[in-house]
Every structure is written in structure tokens, then in C-alpha cells.
UniProtKB/Swiss-Prot annotation:
Pfam families: DapB_C, DapB_N. This is 4-hydroxy-tetrahydrodipicolinate reductase. Catalyzes the conversion of 4-hydroxy-tetrahydrodipicolinate (HTPA) to tetrahydrodipicolinate. It comes from Shewanella baltica (strain OS155 / ATCC BAA-1091). The keyword Ligase does not apply. Its EC number is 1.17.1.8. It catalyses: (S)-2,3,4,5-tetrahydrodipicolinate + NAD(+) + H2O = (2S,4S)-4-hydroxy-2,3,4,5-tetrahydrodipicolinate + NADH + H(+); (S)-2,3,4,5-tetrahydrodipicolinate + NADP(+) + H2O = (2S,4S)-4-hydroxy-2,3,4,5-tetrahydrodipicolinate + NADPH + H(+).
Length: 270
């Protein structure tokens, strides 16, 4: 699409929300139409641009999407699973597209998202950076070549405030590898080890999680054999990489038919 796409950002007052506002401001083809915070927030009525440090945008923080129905085309949501489901329901009822960067959905919630996406265009991705989405393609290749004879471990680290573990990105890494090898991640995943665990089963995929300080996001997949190992690593140094990906997804999504899409499709990697 060559024209501007109007976006609304929910959770505008959080760390990611403020970064999304800044990314929208800096994008040539995105216009910030609305910024939403929870009811009762002290930020309601504050200029979204001043909140994000980019100057006045004349878009005031509101406490309900109902006040912004005519102000945007695509909703961008990096909040929490329960809230994202509520927001997606609203988007379906008001014929709005939605970009979901939230992680930590349970199986039932994923089924709800699939059903809602039959009625409105949705991009959902655990990680919207270009580098991570390229990494998933590299993981497919590594799994094809080395997966059958190596021990596979996934290590991820995030800041102390992240609430879900392992991260959605780490789980997606495991899913990509397991699918390539014809395995079921739910059956072969091992989440942390403690005590006398016995020898490692080569059919498993191990996960280790770090939560510390202000780590933005670090992910490594290790394919370890006797005498050598391959490590594929992505490190994010700023949330802006995820925010820019979300803007790219919103700009792409506005012309799509109802359906559930991912960043691989947005980036043309499928």
C-alpha cells in the first residue's frame, strides 16, 4: 500500500507501547490515530507523542477503543493474553485488522484467535524482528543437516519484567526445529533440568531460560555433537526492532483478506 495506514496502539503507556508510538511517528507510511491505556490510568489525557518523547502529536491517550472507532485501520497489541483476546473480539465487531505481538497464549486462546481471524485480517508473531524471522529459516536448514545426530538446546534471556517463560520466540524456535525433524514439540521438549535426570535423550529439545536486568531479548539454538557444535544466535539491543516490524506488518496487513498471518508472510519468506 502506498498511502498512510492509521494505527491504534493499546498498552500505550508501557515500555513497548511507548516504543511503538515512537516507531509510528518515525514511519513514513504510518499515522498514529489512537493510543489506549487501561481505565483509571494516570496517563489518560496525556499527549501520546510527549509520552514517547517525540513531541506533541495531538493524539491524546484514551481509556477505551470505543472512543477511537473512526480513527484507525489497524490495532497493534503487545499487552497480555487475556487483554489481547478482548481487543481482537472488539476488532472483529468493528471490522478492524490487528497485529498481535503478545506472547503466552494458552491452547484455548490460540483457538479463539484462529476463529476470530476467519472474520478479520490478523498478523500474530512471537517476534517481529527481521533478524529473528530469518533465523527461523536458518534453523530449518540446520535441523535438516544436523538435527538427527546432535543434541539440540535452546537458551533464551529477557529482562526481569517478562512474565512468560520460555519466551514465545524460543518456543517458535523449538516448533520450527521439531517440525523439520518430524517430531512433536509437546512430547520432546524438556523445560529445565534439576536433580538426577539420567543421560540425555537425543530425541529431546532442551529449553533454558534466563531472566535478568534489562536484557531486551537473546536467543540461541545449539546443535551439539562430539567435537563440534553449531550455535545460531540472535540478540536484540532495542525494542525498536520489534516495533519497526509491527509497523511493517500493519502496513502490509491493511490490504489482506481475513485470515491469520505471520511475519514470514509479511517479509515474503514463505
Amino acid at each position: 500500500m502506498s498511502g498512510q495506514v492509521r494505527v491504534a496502539i493499546v498498552g500505550a503507556g508501557g515500555r513497548m507501547g511507548r516504543t511503538l508510538i515512537e516507531a509510528a511517528y518515525n514511519h513514513d507510511h504510518i499515522l498514529l490515530g489512537a493510543a489506549i491505556e487501561r481505565a483509571g490510568s494516570s496517563l489518560v489525557g496525556v499527549d501520546a507523542g510527549e509520552l514517547a518523547g517525540v513531541g506533541k502529536l495531538k493524539v491524546m491517550i484514551m481509556d477505551s477503543l470505543d472512543y477511537a472507532t473512526d480513527d484507525f485501520d489497524v490495532l497493534i497489541d503487545f499487552t497480555a493474553p487475556d487483554a489481547s483476546i478482548v481487543h481482537l473480539d472488539w476488532c472483529v465487531r468493528h471490522k478492524k485488522a490487528m497485529v498481535i505481538g503478545t506472547t503466552g497464549f494458552n491452547h484455548a486462546q490460540k483457538e479463539q484467535i484462529n476463529a476470530f481471524a476467519e472474520q478479520t485480517p490478523v498478523v500474530m508473531a512471537p517476534n517481529m524482528s527481521v533478524g529473528v524471522n530469518l533465523m527461523w529459516k536458518l534453523l530449518e536448514l540446520a535441523a535438516e543437516v544436523m538435527g538427527d545426530y546432535t543434541d539440540i538446546e535452546i537458551i533464551e534471556g529477557h529482562h526481569r519484567h517478562k512474565k512468560d517463560a520460555p519466551s514465545g520466540t524460543a518456543l517458535k524456535m523449538g516448533e520450527v526445529i521439531a517440525k523439520t525433524l518430524g517430531r512433536d514439540l509437546e512430547k520432546c521438549a524438556v523445560y529445565g533440568r534439576e536433580g538426577i535426570t539420567g543421560e540425555r535423550d537425543r530425541e529431546t529439545i532442551g529449553f533454558a531460560t534466563i531472566r535478568a536486568g534489562d536484557l531486551v531479548g537473546e536467543h540461541t539454538a545449539m546443535f551439539a555433537d562430539i567435537g563440534e557444535r553449531l550455535e545460531i544466535t540472535h540478540k536484540a539491543s532495542s525494542r525498536m526492532t520489534f516495533a519497526n516490524g509491527a509497523m511493517r506488518a500493519a502496513h502490509w496487513l491493511v490490504e489482506q483478506k481475513p485470515g491469520l498471518y505471520d511475519m514470514q508472510q509479511v517479509l515474503g519468506l514463505h
